Amino acid sequence: MPDAHFDGKAFVLTLPAQPGVYRMLNAAGDVIYVGKAIDLRKRVSSYFQKSGLSPRIQLMVSQIAGIETTVTRSEAEALLLENNLIKSLAPRYNILFRDDKSYPYLLLTRHIFPRLAFYRGALDDRHQYFGPFPNAGVVKSSIQLLQKVFRLRTCENSVFDHRTRPCLLYQIKRCSGPCVGLITPEAYQQDVKSAAMFLQGKQDEVLKTIEQKMFTASDQQDYEQAAQLRDQMQALRKIQEKQFVDSGKALDADVIACAIEPDSHAVAVNLVMIRSGRHLGDKTFFPQNVYEADISTVLEAFVTQHYLNRSVPPLIILGQKIRVTLLQKLLSDQAGHKITLTTNPIGERRKWLDMAAENAQLALQQMLIQQASQEDRLQALQEALNLPGLARIECFDISHTMGEATIASCVVYDRFAMRNGEYRRYNITGIVPGDDYAAMRDVLQRRYAKLAMEEGKLPDLILIDGGKGQIRVASEVMIELGLNDIPLVGVAKGETRKPGLEQLILPWQEEALHLPDDHPALHLIQQIRDEAHRFAIQGHRAKRAKTRKISTLEQISGIGTKRRQSLLTRFGGLKGVKNASIEELQQTEGISRSLAEKIYRELR
């Protein structure tokens, strides 16, 4: 149990001189730091020395009310446990990198006519995967480029299996029409092979093959085919110019550089991904809780948190020396092959590192400019509302269509940025459809009932997308919950509903507050309100589409769950069912001629 009078020096004497992990707790029982050690007694005792501690560590030590330890069999095991605990507990004094979703891949499915697709998740040996890519946008743009060059299908099998005529992608020359037999399996497989070779970095081989085909077509006076192959070569060369890294070979590597702004303790880590000699793009990370940490400490935290339990390229190039021996062994064991971490690259690899360092510095500068702007906006809002202090703002919006599929959203702004990991949507049921006041009451009660019992962070300000009626309801809820000390502000649209004409409804004054359309406080309110609106609409549309997809068919007499599922599976969704002829509908299991005619009529 945490003890306000915790004696660290006495506690150290009870620790073994063995490898392990230690967790430091404050008086509230929260874990504020997690660390690993080869020798627990020696490492933990270093925190209770009279000298040599940084101001940050001194502050942390002053808050320690207890320490928990776990002995491990080795330093490697301690590192793995430390990494898992940091990710799960997010202690305030550990450097934290956001644990993103798994990286996306480009997928070629196993099929007589393989499908080209975006994929994120566990890998299946039956299919071909290319990547990983730094973000979804790079994958999607790559798919578009490959469609243009190789004309591979992207449709789901459920759609592919039941098409009777080519789709729009065929008409705009982005697909070769395998669904209706407009290309032979052999010719299609050749296109798949060329696409795979290109993704594997064998661009020159692919270009040479296409060039030979072009000359053959020209010799045979098939000038239309020769022109198509020429265009294909030109498109591939453009892609090659954009993405190829002059490596001399098809190399897989990650290049990592770090930039630090000491005065603000801001840090940016840039990760450049090179796969099969192609520059797939880069991604920048902004860690939390950095304080006065140096570049080596930040990079070591990044490599540990980013690569353990994730696919790793054979080469990782770092912009600063770190303790590589243990990490290199762990990553190699995890990958099943040798992983090399190098901190002193030369030649072309040094150029890659310089590129990553420039990316990190640029991203850091942009982030600091944006943060300064956000700080100015937040300060302006604080002054406009005459509030003592603002850091965390939560905003609510309600979205529905004539009372259908009502969704409430809550978005969070904290520490000068939107925190989308803390966004929440709420399904609103059990109210009169279209009653926005009841919907707002419901979401606020659900959101803040737990907070009233000290189970989470309380906001410094609550924004409500609505006018006096919504604010009245919100005030009643907060009084009922005993949270009426949290300021509420309603954001009401002006008479013409144009941005810049918003009225701010303040419960503590009679008149609405009007801010000039160029006021930084208004810009911040608009930013947060628009994000709540977007998030609510997105959830509402998804819920409405799901509801309508089910109900439209089930409202037809004779269509139950089983027949509905058969129809949706056969035609790849409700749109396919609507486009089907009576004869095509009748071919579905369980659908008679008369029922097919009824479905056809009802969906028109």
Swiss-Prot record:
InterPro entries: GIY-YIG_endonuc, GIY-YIG_endonuc_sf, GIY-YIG_UvrC_Cho, Hlx-hairpin-Hlx_DNA-bd_motif, RuvA_2-like, UVR_dom, UVR_dom_sf, UvrABC_protein_C. GO terms for biological process: nucleotide-excision repair; SOS response. The gene is uvrC. One of its GO terms (molecular function) is DNA binding. It is found in: Cytoplasm. GO terms for cellular component: cytoplasm; excinuclease repair complex. The keyword DNA damage applies. Gene3D superfamilies: 5' to 3' exonuclease, C-terminal subdomain (1.10.150.20), GIY-YIG endonuclease (3.40.1440.10), UVR domain (4.10.860.10), UvrC, RNAse H endonuclease domain (3.30.420.340). Belongs to the UvrC family. It comes from Nitrosomonas europaea (strain ATCC 19718 / CIP 103999 / KCTC 2705 / NBRC 14298). The keyword S-adenosyl-L-methionine does not apply. Interacts with UvrB in an incision complex. Residues 204-239 form the UVR domain. Keywords: Cytoplasm, DNA damage, DNA excision, DNA repair, Excision nuclease, SOS response. Residues 17-95 form the GIY-YIG domain. This is UvrABC system protein C. SMART domains: GIYc, HhH1.
